[in-house]
Amino acid sequence: LPVAFLKFAIVLILFIAMSAMIEAQCIGNGGRCNENVGPPYCCSGFCLRQPGQGYGYCKNR
């Protein structure tokens, strides 16, 4: 196999692994969240919190 192909394959594998790690650091819909505390944030980008509650739940807008 050509060296260029092996380099490309290694970079591709690293990119896929990093993408999976970044995605795993967010909270899925239905999970508890607190936008005031910081990461991890909701994957959807929206944390629904009722007034008076210390936490909310991730959901789509």
UniProtKB/Swiss-Prot annotation:
The modification Pyrrolidone carboxylic acid is found at residue 25. Keywords: Antibiotic, Antimicrobial, Disulfide bond, Fungicide, Knottin, Plant defense, Pyrrolidone carboxylic acid, Secreted, Signal. One of its GO terms (biological process) is killing of cells of another organism. It holds the Pfam family Antifungal_pept. Disulfide bonds join 26-43, 33-47, 42-58. Residues 1-24 form the signal peptide. It is found in: Secreted. Three disulfide bonds are present. Found only in seeds. GO terms for cellular component: extracellular region. The presence of a 'disulfide through disulfide knot' structurally defines this protein as a knottin. Possesses antifungal activity and is also active on two tested Gram-positive bacteria but is non-toxic for Gram-negative bacteria and cultured human cells. Belongs to the AMP family. Homodimer. This is Antimicrobial peptide 1. It comes from Mirabilis jalapa (Garden four-o'clock).
